[in-house]
């Protein structure tokens, strides 16, 4: 039992593992140590990046994995044979985002089975992989910018051909509206021959437009007549304008005509007939030739009759 305030002392092997970095001796023990270290490094990366938890991720496990990777990195720095392949500063403090990251694609590790040191050959240095990746990235970046120039040079004539073919199709469908537009667009682009061809096509447009108008007139029904604004005004009469919205079938001022039936109610009533029926109620006789020269008293009387009925 340890007294109060006493410190627990590590054993020799524990002290070496905890406080110091184990310095493996030369020989098979070194090979086994490097293999174990590489295996732990791979497993830690796999758990850190390719971890799909069914429950909530554990912060303690993430911290342990990060500490292990940081320790392996320090060993690699002290050995000086490999460049740091893992930067602890790039790892965010949030463990939730780390656990949901996808694993990077595994790089192929070439292994020489016929060599005398198979374990050493299986462990490919990360520096070589980084150098290879840098070279491939540089070559890809050098190749890709040259591709758009070739594509653009090859696509320009194709676009011109498609534009000209589209113009031809539009001119065939509606030559009257697009003949002038084609002449304006073809003048700055094409030579003088194209402008002369467009000028030749101009007189053909109105003739075809006339034929289209004649066909449209033929397709109209026989009773359809196109009238101008003056003809439309002359065809209408004042009776149609003033008394078009009055239903006179409901107002029968003569009791004898009420028994004539529905035929008499549906008969058209003109303004003169209406004024004749209203004449007995007025003080002065109203002439049929002057229906619109009534006094204000007569208008008031007519409104009273209409409202009362």
UniProtKB/Swiss-Prot annotation:
Polyubiquitinated, which promotes proteasomal degradation. A motif (Nuclear export signal (NES)) lies at residues 233-238. GO terms for cellular component: cytosol; nucleoplasm; nucleus. It is found in: Nucleus; Cytoplasm. Induction: Up-regulated by high fat diet in adipose tissue. Expressed in white and brown adipose tissue. Residues 8-18, 204-216 have a biased composition (Basic and acidic residues). InterPro entries: E2F-SERTA_domain_protein, SERTA_dom. Residues 230-306 are annotated as: Required for transactivation activity. Keywords: Cytoplasm, Nucleus, Transcription, Transcription regulation, Ubl conjugation. Coiled coil: none annotated. Residues 33-80 form the SERTA domain. Disruption phenotype: Resist development of obesity because of enhanced lipolysis and thermogenesis due, in part, to an increase in brown adipocytes number. On high fat diet (HFD), show reduced white adipose tissue (WAT) weight with smaller adipocyte size, improved glucose tolerance and insulin sensitivity with lower fasting glucose and insulin concentrations. Animals on HFD have higher and lower concentrations of adiponectin and leptin, respectively, compared to wild-type. They don't develop liver steatosis and have 57% less adipose tissue macrophage infiltration. One of its GO terms (biological process) is negative regulation of cell growth. Acts at E2F-responsive promoters as coregulator to integrate signals provided by PHD- and/or bromodomain-containing transcription factors. May act as coactivator as well as corepressor of E2F1-TFDP1 and E2F4-TFDP1 complexes on E2F consensus binding sites, which would activate or inhibit E2F-target genes expression. Modulates fat storage by down-regulating the expression of key genes involved in adipocyte lipolysis, thermogenesis and oxidative metabolism. This is SERTA domain-containing protein 2. It comes from Mus musculus (Mouse). The gene is Sertad2.
